[in-house]
């Protein structure tokens, strides 16, 4: 006789479209954030048009972060995904709003370190969303049943 273990419940996974949309917006957000220090570096090297590009890219980065937040909400509620991306995206949006405000105010003592934190957060988020999904059951604490083949009874 052989035995097999029956899991307590089927795992709930985010729907593929919601996961794809969130991954795409996180990737775009990270790429736009990576461009910011490159653009301001160009300005510091004497390419004065780079400052305008830095400002415009900040706007695109902020809009992308808001779309990322929307994608996180769609992955969470109708998409049956986890809630943590909503909170992570909300944090990124708040940080970018503060970044834009400090940039226009030319408060560089806050603007530069905040930019480093935003890029670090975007990298961590990017790594997290591109990790392969783990098989997790809804009720991970419930013991699995052992079923004996042919008996139809769980033990």
Per-segment meaning from a language model:
Residues 2-155:
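Polytopic transmembrane helical bundles with strong interfacial aromatic enrichment
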């Amino acid at each position: 006789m052989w035995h097999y273990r029956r899991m307590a419940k089927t795992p709930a996974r985010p729907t593929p479209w919601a996961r794809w949309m969130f991954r795409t917006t996180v990737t775009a957000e990270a790429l736009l954030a990576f461009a910011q220090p490159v653009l301001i570096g160009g300005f510091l090297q004497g390419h004065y048009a780079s400052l305008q590009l830095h400002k415009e890219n900040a706007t695109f980065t902020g809009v992308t972060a808001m779309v990322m937040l929307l994608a996180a909400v769609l992955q969470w509620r109708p998409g049956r995904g986890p809630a943590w991306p909503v909170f992570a995206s909300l944090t990124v949006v708040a940080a970018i709003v503060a970044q834009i405000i400090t940039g226009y105010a030319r408060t560089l003592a806050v603007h530069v370190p905040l930019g480093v934190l935003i890029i670090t957060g975007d990298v961590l988020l990017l790594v997290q969303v591109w990790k392969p999904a783990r098989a997790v059951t809804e009720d991970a604490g419930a013991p699995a049943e052992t079923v004996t083949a042919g008996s139809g009874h769980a033990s």
